[in-house]
C-alpha cells in the first residue's frame, strides 16, 4: 500500500513538473523582441549612446564660465604674518579664508564650438551604431529561426516517410502471407524502414542543434523548453525581383546605418581637425575673484556710549620749559577680537581681469595634434569608402544569390510535381503487380528527396529575399 501511494505521489509530482516545463511556442516577433532586449552587443551600444549624450552635455557646459569655491582653516605659530594686519607676530594665529573664482574663455580659435559640433555628430553616429547592432541581431535571429523552421519541416517529412514505409510494410506482409508478393519485398521494406528511422534520428538531431543555436543567440539556457511557430509564407508572388542590384545598392546607401555612421564620422573628423587647428590661435579669457579672511589676532575697539576726560600733553612753554596739558574727551569701551562674520564682511577683496595667451612655441604639440587630426580625417574617408565597397559587394552577392535561389525553387517545385505523379502511378501499378518493388521504392525515395530539396530551396530563397529586404530597409517580419 505504501509503495502504491508513493508511486501515485511520484506520478503527480512528475505531471506537475511536466506542466511547468511545457514548451513555449515562440513567434518570430517574440524571438526578435526578446533578442533585442537581452543581446549584450545592443546593451553595449546603448551605453555608448549614453556616453555620447554625456559628452555632448559636457561640450555645451564648457562654453559657460566656470565657478569654483575654496576655503581653509589653519593654525600658525612662531614668527608668521597675520593675514588681517600683514604684520609679523610671534603669537599663535588661528585664521581662515574663503574665496571664489570664475573664468570665462571668450575665444580660442573656435575650439569649443568645434568640440560641440563634433560631440553632437558623434552622438548621432553612436545612435546609428545602435541601429546597426539591432539590425544585425534581427538578421541573425531570423537566420537561426528559418534554420529551425527548415529542420522542423524536414523532420516532419522524414517522419511522414517513416510512417508511409511502416504502413506499406504492414500491407506487404499481409500480401506476402497470402503469397501475392515475394518475401524479398518484405525484407527490402524492413531495410528501408531502418533507413528511414536513421533519417528521422538525424533530422531530429539537426532540429535540436538548430534550436540550441537559437537559444544561445537569445542567451537562454540549453535546458529551456522551446518550440517555434511555423510561418505562413507564400513565396509564389515573390519569386520576381523587380529591382536591379544597383537600385538596391542606392537604396541601401540611404537606409543602412553603417553608411550613415561612416558619413557622420567623416564630418566629425573634419571638426576634430578644425578644433586642433584652434590651438595655434591666441586665447582670450576673463576672470573674476572674491576672497575674505579671518584671524583671531585682529583687535578692534568697541565703544560703550560713555566718555571720559583725559589729560593730554601738548607741548612746552618757551623759556621755562613748563609742560602744557589739555583735557581731551574720549569715548570709553573695550578692545576685543571681531566676530568671524564681521571680519569676513570687513576683509572682502574683489578682482576682475582679462587674460591673453599667445602660443609661440610649445614643443610642436599644437601642430602635431593638428597633423594627427588630419591623418584621422583621411582614415575616416578611407573607412567610408571601405564600408561603401563592402556594402556594394554584399548587395551584389545577395542579389545574385536571391536570383539563383528563386530559379532553384521554381525548378524544384516542377520536379516535385513530376515525381509526385510518378510516385502515384508507381504505387497504383505496384498494387496491381505491374512493377516490381525496386521501381516502386525508387519512385517513393525520389519523391521524398525532391520534397526535401523543395523545402531547402524554399527557405533558402526566403532567407535570400529577406537579406535583400534588409538592405532596402524593409520590415523583416513575415
Give names to the regions the model predicted.
Residues 19-72, 78, 222, 229-270, ...:
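Bacterial Sec-pathway N-terminal export signals of envelope proteins
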Residues 1-10, 14-34, 204-250, 296, ...:
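Terminal intrinsically disordered/low-complexity segments used for targeting and assembly
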Residues 20-24, 70-104, 232-240, 274, ...:
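Small/polar, glycine/serine/threonine/aspartate-rich low-complexity segments that form flexible
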Residues 26, 136-251, 401, 405, ...:
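Periplasmic alpha-helical coiled-coil/stalk elements that build and connect Gram-negative outer-membrane
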Residues 43-47, 60, 92, 106-134, ...:
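Sec/SRP-type N-terminal targeting helices
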Residues 99-101, 145, 249, 353-355, ...:
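Membrane-embedded beta-strand positions in outer-membrane beta-barrel channels/transporters
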Residues 47, 61, 198-220, 414-474:
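Short segments within alpha-helical structural elements
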Amino acid at each position: 500500500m505504501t509503495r502504491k501511494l508513493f508511486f501515485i505521489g511520484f506520478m503527480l509530482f512528475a505531471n506537475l513538473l511536466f506542466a511547468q516545463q511545457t514548451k513555449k511556442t515562440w513567434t518570430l516577433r517574440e524571438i526578435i523582441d526578446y533578442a533585442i532586449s537581452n543581446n549584450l552587443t545592443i546593451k553595449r551600444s546603448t551605453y555608448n549612446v549614453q556616453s555620447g549624450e554625456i559628452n555632448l552635455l559636457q561640450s555645451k557646459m564648457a562654453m559657460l564660465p566656470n565657478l569654483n569655491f575654496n576655503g581653509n582653516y589653519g593654525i600658525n605659530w612662531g614668527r608668521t604674518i597675520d593675514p588681517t594686519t600683514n604684520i609679523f607676530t610671534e603669537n599663535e594665529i588661528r585664521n581662515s579664508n574663503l574665496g571664489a573664482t570664475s573664468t570665462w574663455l571668450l575665444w580660442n580659435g573656435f575650439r569649443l564650438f568645434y568640440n560641440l559640433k563634433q560631440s553632437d555628430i558623434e552622438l548621432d553616429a553612436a545612435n546609428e551604431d545602435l541601429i546597426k547592432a539591432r539590425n544585425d541581431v534581427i538578421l541573425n535571429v531570423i537566420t537561426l529561426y528559418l534554420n529551425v523552421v527548415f529542420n522542423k519541416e524536414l523532420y516532419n517529412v522524414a517522419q511522414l516517410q517513416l510512417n508511409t514505409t511502416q504502413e506499406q510494410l504492414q500491407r506487404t506482409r499481409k500480401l506476402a502471407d497470402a503469397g501475392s508478393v515475394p518475401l524479398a519485398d518484405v525484407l527490402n521494406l524492413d531495410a528501408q524502414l531502418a533507413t528511414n528511422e536513421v533519417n528521422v534520428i538525424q533530422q531530429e538531431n539537426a532540429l535540436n542543434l538548430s534550436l540550441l543555436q537559437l537559444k544561445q543567440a537569445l542567451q537562454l539556457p540549453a535546458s529551456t523548453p522551446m518550440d517555434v511557430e511555423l510561418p505562413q509564407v507564400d513565396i509564389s508572388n515573390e519569386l520576381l525581383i523587380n529591382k536591379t542590384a544597383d537600385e538596391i545598392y542606392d537604396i541601401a546607401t540611404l537606409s543602412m546605418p553603417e553608411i550613415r555612421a561612416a558619413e557622420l564620422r567623416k564630418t566629425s573628423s573634419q571638426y576634430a581637425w578644425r578644433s586642433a587647428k584652434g590651438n595655434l590661435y591666441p586665447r582670450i579669457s576673463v576672470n573674476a575673484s572674491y576672497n575674505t579672511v579671518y584671524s583671531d589676532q585682529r583687535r578692534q575697539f568697541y565703544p560703550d556710549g560713555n566718555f571720559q576726560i583725559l589729560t593730554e600733553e601738548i607741548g612746552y612753554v618757551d623759556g621755562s620749559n613748563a609742560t602744557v596739558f589739555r583735557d581731551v574727551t574720549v569715548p570709553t569701551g573695550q578692545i576685543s577680537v571681531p566676530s568671524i562674520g564681521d571680519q569676513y564682511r570687513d576683509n572682502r577683496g574683489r578682482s576682475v581681469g582679462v587674460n591673453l595667451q599667445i602660443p609661440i612655441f610649445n614643443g610642436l604639440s599644437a601642430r602635431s595634434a593638428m597633423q594627427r587630426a588630419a591623418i584621422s580625417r583621411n582614415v575616416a574617408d578611407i573607412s567610408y569608402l571601405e564600408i561603401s565597397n563592402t556594402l556594394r559587394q554584399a548587395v551584389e552577392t545577395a542579389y545574385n544569390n536571391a536570383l539563383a535561389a528563386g530559379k532553384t525553387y521554381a525548378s524544384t517545385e516542377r520536379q516535385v510535381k513530376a515525381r509526385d505523379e510518378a510516385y502515384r502511378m508507381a504505387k497504383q501499378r505496384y498494387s496491381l503487380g505491374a512493377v516490381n518493388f525496386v521501381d516502386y521504392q525508387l519512385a517513393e525515395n525520389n519523391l521524398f528527396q525532391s520534397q526535401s530539396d523543395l523545402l531547402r530551396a524554399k527557405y533558402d530563397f526566403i532567407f535570400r529575399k529577406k537579406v535583400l529586404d534588409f538592405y532596402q530597409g524593409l520590415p523583416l517580419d513575415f
